[in-house]
């Protein structure tokens, strides 16, 4: 995918990624991934028992168009780590998207000091992260649109209204179910 000088040349990166991906969708994936803190996915390179590598995603190639798409999975640790106190000791990431640390050598990080390497040291991630204009435009649109406080609050409140009767029913029937007050408190944290 990246054998055309893309990691060091922004125009080459754009050219190569445009050839093999839907560039808008590829950048939008990175925007959403970083916005929801999918810190246990393609931008977290663990160095445990072998080479440093990311996980929890697949690349899918459409045979007819020969376009590559990234498919995330195992997003259970997403939407965590909004504050330093809430950082997950395993999935905590030291670098912003595309940044590098420790001259690209593995280093311990997080409260468990897990060995990891900056994702920006990978040629594909470096090329991806070099698309600053696209990233900024898509990120601004995302954060002022579907990920805005108003939009997210509207959806969460709608889901609260749909789910609340079932939470009350479960709380009345099961001793181990959260109370309605506990559930509402958790929803309010969102």
List where the protein language model places each region.
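Middle-to-C-terminal accessory/interaction subdomains
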Residues: 1-57, 62-190
